[in-house]
Amino acid sequence: MSVQRYFIYLAYDGTHYHGWQIQPNGISIQECLMKALATFLRKDTEVIGAGRTDAGVHASLMVAHFDYEGEPLDVDKVAEKLNRLLPQDISVYKVCRVKPDAHARFDATARTYKYYITTVKFPFNRQYRYRIHNPLDFQKMNEAALTLFHYSDFTSFSKLHTDVKTNICKIMHAEWTQEDEYTWVFTIQADRFLRNMVRAIVGTLLEVGRGKLSVVDFRKIIEQQNRCKAGTSAPGNALFLVNVEYPQEIFE
């Protein structure tokens, strides 16, 4: 029997998880998804995600793939069954068949993240916003964000001692916009991201907004390719993976 590959489009609230990737010391999104698939398919099934979100980080859209040997699956039934088996804070939008060599991680052409900050104390969104207590200069922060387009090596914003072979990324979009009177959103899109990269960029841009770093300082931090020179990473609870893009030809 032939082996088919399927993409799962899902969302999750990362509050109570130790990130996407299976961990020895805590529950992960990947583990929950693999358990649900194993129950439904009645065999252990590996799941590969488009990326590895950190502990506490959310996804309004994540993509993962799995293989199945046997008769082609009814994708609507798979999605429906997974939603019954998964916890309330993980939801499957759809499942679709892709070409056998399609890869959720390596075939992704772009990923988009959003980071939310708020200027007010509000109990109902505290898990999804980073509260800022002092005024920020968003014009300066956007000026600094524009410099990201001029560089490709983002070692300064990468978690230290990771197993990645290259720190080269192509940034396609990076901008702060105001969502309402109290909420600002940083949207960033790139072909790939390094571990902790978005939170490190946000944390450093916040230092620019507070007047502790200039736009020139921000540029120098990138050029120094030294994580110790950049700002503290912003908390993970306000970060969302919101989109992953693929070339049309990988779909069946």
From Swiss-Prot:
<protein>
    <recommendedName>
        <fullName>tRNA pseudouridine synthase A</fullName>
        <ecNumber>5.4.99.12</ecNumber>
    </recommendedName>
</protein>
<feature type="active site" description="Nucleophile">
    <location>
        <position position="54"/>
    </location>
</feature>
<dbReference type="GO" id="GO:0003723">
    <property type="term" value="F:RNA binding"/>
</dbReference>
<dbReference type="InterPro" id="IPR020094">
    <property type="entry name" value="TruA/RsuA/RluB/E/F_N"/>
</dbReference>
<dbReference type="InterPro" id="IPR020097">
    <property type="entry name" value="PsdUridine_synth_TruA_a/b_dom"/>
</dbReference>
<keyword id="KW-0413">Isomerase</keyword>
<dbReference type="GO" id="GO:0160147">
    <property type="term" value="F:tRNA pseudouridine(38-40) synthase activity"/>
</dbReference>
<dbReference type="Pfam" id="PF01416">
    <property type="entry name" value="PseudoU_synth_1"/>
</dbReference>
<comment type="function">
    <text>Formation of pseudouridine at positions 38, 39 and 40 in the anticodon stem and loop of transfer RNAs.</text>
</comment>
<keyword id="KW-0819">tRNA processing</keyword>
<dbReference type="InterPro" id="IPR020103">
    <property type="entry name" value="PsdUridine_synth_cat_dom_sf"/>
</dbReference>
<feature type="binding site">
    <location>
        <position position="113"/>
    </location>
    <ligand>
        <name>substrate</name>
    </ligand>
</feature>
<comment type="subunit">
    <text>Homodimer.</text>
</comment>
<comment type="similarity">
    <text>Belongs to the tRNA pseudouridine synthase TruA family.</text>
</comment>
<dbReference type="GO" id="GO:0031119">
    <property type="term" value="P:tRNA pseudouridine synthesis"/>
</dbReference>
<dbReference type="InterPro" id="IPR001406">
    <property type="entry name" value="PsdUridine_synth_TruA"/>
</dbReference>
<dbReference type="InterPro" id="IPR020095">
    <property type="entry name" value="PsdUridine_synth_TruA_C"/>
</dbReference>
